[in-house]
Curated annotation (Swiss-Prot):
Protein keywords: DNA-binding, Plasmid, Plasmid partition, Repressor, Transcription, Transcription regulation
Domain notes: Although this has the same function as TubR of B.thuringiensis subsp. israelensis there is little sequence homology and the dimerization interface is different.
Consequence when changing R94A: No DNA binding
GO molecular function: DNA binding
Protein name: DNA-binding protein TubR
Function in brief: A DNA-binding protein that is part of the type III plasmid partition system used to ensure correct segregation of the pBc10987 plasmid. Binds TubZ filaments but does not influence the GTPase activity of TubZ with or without DNA. Cooperatively binds to multiple regions in tubC (centromere-like site) upstream of its own gene with consensus sequence N(T/A)ATTNC(C/G)GNAAT(A/T)N; probably forms an extended DNA-protein filament. Binds sites in its own promoter region and presumably represses its expression; its effect on RNA expression has not been shown.
UniProt note: phenotype after gene disruption: Increased expression of TubZ.
Induction record: Probably part of the tubR-tubZ operon.
Superkingdom in the source lineage: Bacteria
GO biological process, alphabetically ordered: plasmid partitioning
Source organism of this protein record: Bacillus cereus (strain ATCC 10987 / NRS 248)
Amino acid sequence: MKLLSNISMSSSEIIDVLCENLNDGIWALRVLYAEGAMNKEKLWDYINQYHKDYQIENEKDYEGKKILPSRYALDIMTARLEGAGLISFKAIGRVRIYDVTDLGNVLIKELEKRVEKNN
C-alpha cells in the first residue's frame, strides 16, 4: 500500500472542500450552533423547522416538504457530519447528544465570513 505523504493541503483548502461538500448538513450545523447540544429527535425537529422558516422567509413558496423527511435521512446526515469531524456526540444512556466540534465551529465562522463578503 502506497502512502500519500507527498500530498499537502492548507487549512484554507481543507475548509473549502468541507464547504463544497456540506450540502444539507449546513442545517444541522446551523441548528447545533444556534441552539446548543441536543438529542437526535430534537435535532430532527429543529432542522426541519429552521429550513421551513428559511423557505417561508426567503422563498415565499413553502410547499410543506421537509428537508429531512425520515429518520433514515437524519441518520445519513449525522453520520456524514460525524465522519467529517464537524459534529460529535456523547452517549447518555441510550440517547446521543449531538454538538458542534471545534472544526465545525471553524467551518461555521468561515461560512459566515463568505456570506458577509458576498453581501
